[in-house]
Amino acid sequence: MQISLQIHLSSFTFLLLIFLLPVLSESQVASSESQTLLEIQKQLQYPQVLQSWTDTTNFCHIRPSPSLRIICLHGHVTELTVTGNRTSKLSGSFHKLFTLLTQLSSLKTLSLTSLGISGSLSPKIITKLSPSLESLNLSSNFISGKIPEEIVSLKNLKSLVLRDNMFWGFVSDDLRGLSNLQELDLGGNKLGPEVPSLPSKLTTVSLKNNSFRSKIPEQIKKLNNLQSLDLSSNEFTGSIPEFLFSIPSLQILSLDQNLLSGSLPNSSCTSSKIITLDVSHNLLTGKLPSCYSSKSFSNQTVLFSFNCLSLIGTPNAKYQRPLSFCQNQASKAIAVEPIPKAKDKDSARIKLGLVILIIIGVIILAAILVLLVLIALKRRRSRSEDDPFEVNNSNNERHASDKVSVCSTTTASSKSLPDSRRVPQTMRSAVIGLPPYRVFSLEELEEATNDFDAASLFCEQLYRGCLREGIPVTVRVIKLKQKSLPQSLAQQMEVLSKLRHMHLVSVLGHSIASNQDHNQHAGHTIFIVQEYISSGSLRDFLTNCRKKEVLKWPQRMAIAIGVARGIQFLHMGVAPGIFGNNLKIENIMLDETLTVKISGYTIPLPSKVGEERPQAKKPRSNEDREKEDVYQFGVILLQIITGKVVAAGSSEMGSLKLQLENGLRDEPSVLSSLADPSVKGSYAYESLRTTVEFAINCLCEDQSKRPSIEDVVWNLQYTIQVQQGWRPSSGNHESSMKAIYE
């Protein structure tokens, strides 16, 4: 009986082991791969997200987070996702790191982003990566060199993301070998000049911010699954091809900041699926297709500012350049268009012959020039015997106005600055150091704010918190009056994700909770995660004697133009533009380097709980709200100049404005006495005078005479140029001014 019981127990144990072995193998990574992961930690120089790894770490049981995710199957790592927050390059070689990655032979997903990785991708390493790899993301690092042609050996790849690195030159001529590829993101490199052949299954293509210099290739029309195409910030030339608007699935088309000429095709009206079309900052001429003024296209966002379109009589006409500018630039763009690569021996010979002819021509021309110079020198010597000194006197004319035109529409106008007005400052400034925009889980935000504890609340509906990665943030809680349709919310979140700029307290991400998700909030509640700036506001600096001394005139001009560029981005850098922002010195934040960060600006969302709109009042137009923002900027500028804190529309502000107007008409010493004593000796009088004059223009009671935000930026650039040309009698502020302007 006892022997029988032992046999049964042994059988049971054996069966139990058979069932448990697969489970154990999935929960415990192979020891060799554990050592590989620890070596990867070492090669990455122990980033914060990996600091908890030790010899005893069970890698398959690490809780997934937005910055770290490891998935195991049958004892092998199938996914490794590590997201750091490094903004500078790590020292040392990373060849060993890439070699270690080849030892994870079952990887399907590999993502190493913002980790400071540098060096180049070795072709041998690429060929030895896991053959089952489906997703490769090495974005936001410092990887340089060419993208190896061997990349096409990764036949199962569905997503290839190499954006924001330092890759340069030609991409592999033919990426069609990646037959399963659906996402290709090579933005933010120096690739070019020609677009490689693309695989047919692509749904998302981003080649933005590179050095592509060709016409938009016809091969794109064969990408029938394409939903998003971003070719912005390159040097694409020629006209916008009509075939782009016949791609059946295309929803987002970004062609802005190129050298595209001609007119916008009428066929762009026939593509009802395109939600966003951005052709701004090009060389387009002619008229807009009439459909864009039709109500049937009200759900479509079309951006076309800073071209040379004929929009006479429309509010958008002021955002267009002169026709002559586009014609001149288009002819130059055609002249520098690269010669296509030779496809056979005959074309190679022709190209070589052309090069030889050009060289011979240059040599002959140089010889003629040398001969002419020798003749001229000989004649000059013969004249110098009679007149040994030849003097040329040139007088520098000073452009200064003795009369002050208060509330004129321009100050230090375009006549003073013809060059600065030709190509406006790009409004899409790179935001260095920000983590990628993402959707947060509600649990993450509860953890960051200690369950939205009252101690974390430092302003109405605004909580201070800290993400798991150690990044300090603010979380704004917005309760909507009623539930919105998912499609409507998705479109609003798309706009929200664009609110990232050097001079804004940028949005890092969001979370949406419904009644079921979070029982504290009825209906939809939106949680907006933004940067946290701890250094203080402009008001703090102007009201603190010690901090105030830091703000000399060059620093104040940098702050002024920073505020202006932030407003310009809100008005013109996103679609639709954001107007009626709560602009005051309390909301102008300054970081450790005195870089401006505007907070409290309007968040474009539906009506919020507690927000009532009077029925009797007519809604204000965007133009009215734009001019209101300019007025509020004028108030900020007034306070920057004088160092005095005044409220908009107050009697103190009116009195201060009147004193400055009188100071402009009086002796220079009178106006100088009205400036903040803290800036004494650090400014050029002409810079002070034009800044005061422009501040008064912004404060005109007649809003039609207030300048546009574009004029604000241009005129502030003029005052900075004036300051750059001034040499102080004591101390050297020129170098700081140069750094500010650049």
Curated annotation (Swiss-Prot):
Q: Which residues form the signal peptide?
A: 1-25
Query: Topological domain, Extracellular: which ranges?
Result: 26-354
Spans annotated as Disordered: 386-424
**Which parts are the LRR repeats?**
74-96, 104-128, 130-154, 156-177, 178-204, 206-223, 224-247, 249-271, 273-294
Q: Which reaction does it catalyse?
A: L-seryl-[protein] + ATP = O-phospho-L-seryl-[protein] + ADP + H(+); L-threonyl-[protein] + ATP = O-phospho-L-threonyl-[protein] + ADP + H(+)
Regions that span the bilayer: 355-375
The record's listing under InterPro entries reads: Kinase-like_dom_sf, Leu-rich_rpt, Leu-rich_rpt_typical-subtyp, LRR_dom_sf, PRK1-6/SRF4-like, Prot_kinase_dom, Ser-Thr/Tyr_kinase_cat_dom
Q: What EC number(s) has UniProt assigned to this enzyme?
A: 2.7.11.1
Bias-annotated ranges (Polar residues): 406-417
The UniProt entry lists membrane topology as: Single-pass type I membrane protein
Q: What's the main place this protein lives? A: membrane
The Protein kinase domain covers which part of the protein? 426-720
Where does the record place it?
Membrane
Give the Cytoplasmic compartment stretches of this protein. Answer: 376-742
Q: Which keywords are on file for this protein?
A: ATP-binding, Glycoprotein, Kinase, Leucine-rich repeat, Membrane, Nucleotide-binding, Receptor, Repeat, Serine/threonine-protein kinase, Signal, Transferase, Transmembrane, Transmembrane helix
GO CC entries: membrane
**Which residues bear sugar attachments?**
N85, N137, N209, N266, N299
Q: Which PANTHER family match?
A: LEUCINE-RICH REPEAT RECEPTOR-LIKE PROTEIN KINASE PXC1, OS03G0145102 PROTEIN
> What family is it from?
Belongs to the protein kinase superfamily. Ser/Thr protein kinase family.
Q: What is this protein called?
A: Probable LRR receptor-like serine/threonine-protein kinase At2g02780
